[in-house]
Amino acid sequence: MDPNEKAVYLTFDDGPIPEVTPWVLDLLDKHNIKATFFMVGDNIRKHPDEFRMVVERGHRIGNHTFNHIRGFEYTAKNYLGNTEQAKIFMEMGGDINCNVEKVLYPLLFRPPHGHMFANQYLTLKRTYKIVMWDLVTRDYSKRMRPEQALNN
């Protein structure tokens, strides 16, 4: 990620989700676009087929903790442990036989809700490239109409 490069990076959080991930992957394939998926470890456990689809199509994967926990609500030990649990699970390929090395390294991390304490950040940045976001469409809101999300 060259700061001087003019680029747009598409990222998707909280997956894999069977109702959404295949549709997003098909749309990305249609336009020959690669993206980064910040995965929740427990969702990988619950939806290994969707995890495999992301990996096999060559998209990057990043760590989004095992249980999508908020850093401000946990001690550093618990937060870092939950993050490590997700990392181990992703390195194992989510208990499925797929090669994740080409899409997992270098390690990326995005904190759920964008929140974590400074000590959590300082520890994680030794292992991960911390990736935040510039634009939140709020497309996850049940009260948000598609047109509103598009205009965010």
Regions found by a protein language model. Name each.
Residues 20, 69-99, 115-152:
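Alpha-helical scaffold elements lining the catalytic groove of polysaccharide deacetylases
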Residues 99-108:
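A short coil-to-beta-strand element that immediately follows conserved catalytic motifs
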Residues 1-72, 78, 85, 89, ...:
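Active-site beta->alpha N-cap acidic-glycine motif
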